[in-house]
Regions:
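Short gly/ser/thr-rich secondary-structure transition/capping motifs
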Residues: 21-28, 56-59, 123-129, 162-164
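Cysteine-nucleophile active-site neighborhood
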Residues: 47-120
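N-terminal beta1-alpha1 ligand-phosphate binding loop
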Residues: 2-24, 186-187
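C-terminal and late-domain segments of enzyme folds
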Residues: 151-203
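Structural motif
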Residues: 42-44
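Pocket-forming structural segment of enzyme catalytic cores
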Residues: 88-165
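Short acidic low-complexity segments
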Residues: 26-37
Length: 203
């Protein structure tokens, strides 16, 4: 069973629907016991890093997710959920993340040509830095759907894929059982479903 963490951030039911479409057993939950019993965990998220980190901390869900990941359970963060896996974010100040991956989250603005629209919204290509079972069903250059104004950097240890938007931006990361996608698999059509299938098949 896959636990999609419900901590009041993000459209969780489109994600749940995507898992159902590929025949996966997934639930949206904030129940700590259910998260502990799950085989895999999805940490979704949209919005501000500070607010999401606060909700995870105050609900105690952040600690549960972190402990499960440290025990070896497959965990995938999506969009803001991926950013929360890192040590810190510089979104409107400096805020601590879960610290499961080395790196930080910084604004796209100032790092790319000022003529580019921020946030990056829309389809963009994925360029792999290495092979990984998460991407076993997709190909180099396949397109995924992005909506973000911040990106992960200083994350060479976990970098899995980049996308080009004025410069190379982190699109996906993976280190051991912890992984993340900056894009939204649930909004990325067949490519997104194939990525979720790859996640479901991880040991």
């Amino acid at each position: 069973m896959i636990a999609i963490i419900d901590y009041g951030v993000g459209n969780l039911f489109s994600l749940l629907s995507s898992f159902k479409r590929i025949g996966a057993d997934a639930v949206v939950t904030s129940d700590k016991e259910m998260i502990e019993k799950a085989d895999k965990i999805i940490l979704p998220g949209v919005g501000a890093f500070q607010d999401a980190a606060k909700k995870l901390r105050e609900s105690g869900l952040g600690e549960v997710v972190k402990k499960q990941a440290q025990n070896g359970k497959p965990l995938m963060g999506i969009c803001l959920g991926m950013q929360l896996l890192f040590e810190k974010s510089f979104e409107y100040g400096e805020h601590e993340g879960l610290g499961l991956l080395k790196g930080k989250v910084v604004p796209i603005k100032g790092a790319v040509d000022p003529s580019l629209k921020i946030p990056q919204i829309g389809w963009n290509g994925l360029h792999f830095t290495r092979s990984h079972p998460l991407f076993k069903y997709i190909q180099e250059g396949d397109h995924a759907y992005f909506v973000h104004s911040y990106y992960a950097t200083d994350c060479e240890d976990s970098l899995l894929a980049t996308t080009e938007y004025g410069k190379e931006l982190t699109a996906a990361v993976a280190q051991g059982n912890v992984m993340g996608c900056q894009f939204h698999p649930e909004k990325s059509g067949e490519v997104g479903l194939r990525i979720l299938r790859g996640f479901c098949e991880l040991e």
